[in-house]
Every structure is written in structure tokens, then in C-alpha cells.
Amino acid sequence: MAKYTDAKCRQCRREGTKLFLKGDRCFTDKCAFDRRPYAPGQHGRARKKVSDYAVQLREKQKVRRMYGILEQQFHAYFTKADMAKGVTGANLLSLLERRLDNVIYRLGFANSRNQARQLVRHGIFTLNGRKVNIPSLQVRIGDTIEVPEKSRKIPVLAEAQEVIARRGCPAWLEADGANFRGVVKALPQREDIQFPINEHLIVELYSK
């Protein structure tokens, strides 16, 4: 399966914002973006004239990297969002948020989306009582994600209650750290996504 090989901190510096790809490390003084908040490379500090297209492209790349999705799959999400009823940009973000790996990250069962993706691929979680290993699976209202008893001693999962208390949980999800369970209460709305994203730029880019 194709994946990013570029350093995670380099991706944040290239996009000019924290993408929280390294989980808790991003909140410490070890964060490379805090120490060097400019693009990587010899000319990273140089000021460049940025075109409208470049701004749109950077916004798309930022969101794509944040969710850890390659271009072909991201474009497929956009196509699906564009064909659905409602606002295309909001539809796109809802589809991204409803990915199983993202939901597990939001519930506090992983420190980053990448870690959540790895845990899903190893079959650590069950969805409605059935073992799943597909990170891109779309959750629905009423779905229950749970960690089986035998997997609850995995360090990152054992810390779930602490992570949930520290990071909180979106209103559309219900996290039960004590029982290693999460429930999808509703579909994510635009206001549930606090990360600074200008989805209109992505729509403009793909509409050219």
C-alpha cells in the first residue's frame, strides 16, 4: 500500500501549520514546527509571491496530509462529496471525519491518525462486534467501536481514559474510556471541526 515517506515534521513545516501528525509530541517543546516555523530546505525562509492556485493547492495538501490520504483517494472523496446533497466542502470534511482511523483518533484510542491507522490494520478494534482492519471504512450513526479485552493492555490503549480527559471528544462521538468503547451519536457537522481549514479553496481548486 502506498504511503508517505517524507518526515512528518517536514510536512507540517511545508504546509505552514501544525498537522498534529506525531500526537502528543506536537504539544511539547520538542515540536520541530515550533522551533522552525518556516518551510524546509535551503530557501525555506525566503519570501515568495504566492498565486491563487498555489494557495488553493497548499490548502488541499494540508488537509490531505492531515488525514494521511494520497491524492487519488482524496479526489475520490471530493467526487463523492460533490455528488451528494448539501455543500460540497462540508460534505468532504464529513467524509474525512467519518473514516474509522480518524474516529479512533478522535475517541482518544490513539495519539495520532497514523497510529490509529496502524492499530486498525492490526485488527485491534471491533465495529458493532465484528473485527475490522480497514482504516478508510465509513462509520454510521449508532456504530459502536470497541477494544476487545485481550487488546486492552496495549500501552497506548491503556492510556485512553487519560487522553480522553486531556483532549476531549467531539460532540458527535461518545467516548467511554473505562470500557474501551466509543459510539457514533451523529454525523459530524462543519462546526465540529475546529482545525483551521478553508474547504472553499479545495472546492475552487478541483472546480477548475
From Swiss-Prot:
Matches recorded under Pfam families: Ribosomal_S4, S4
Cellular component annotations (GO), alphabetically ordered: small ribosomal subunit
A GO MF term: structural constituent of ribosome
Keywords in alphabetical order: Ribonucleoprotein, Ribosomal protein, RNA-binding, rRNA-binding
CDD domains for this protein: S4 (cd00165)
S4 RNA-binding domain boundaries: 98-161
SUPFAM superfamilies tied to this protein: Alpha-L RNA-binding motif
Residues that span the membrane, as ranges: none
GO process terms (BP): ribosomal small subunit biogenesis; translation
Subunit comment: Part of the 30S ribosomal subunit. Contacts protein S5. The interaction surface between S4 and S5 is involved in control of translational fidelity.
Job description of the protein: One of the primary rRNA binding proteins, it binds directly to 16S rRNA where it nucleates assembly of the body of the 30S subunit. With S5 and S12 plays an important role in translational accuracy.
Official protein name in the record: Small ribosomal subunit protein uS4
Organism of origin: Nitratidesulfovibrio vulgaris (strain ATCC 29579 / DSM 644 / CCUG 34227 / NCIMB 8303 / VKM B-1760 / Hildenborough)
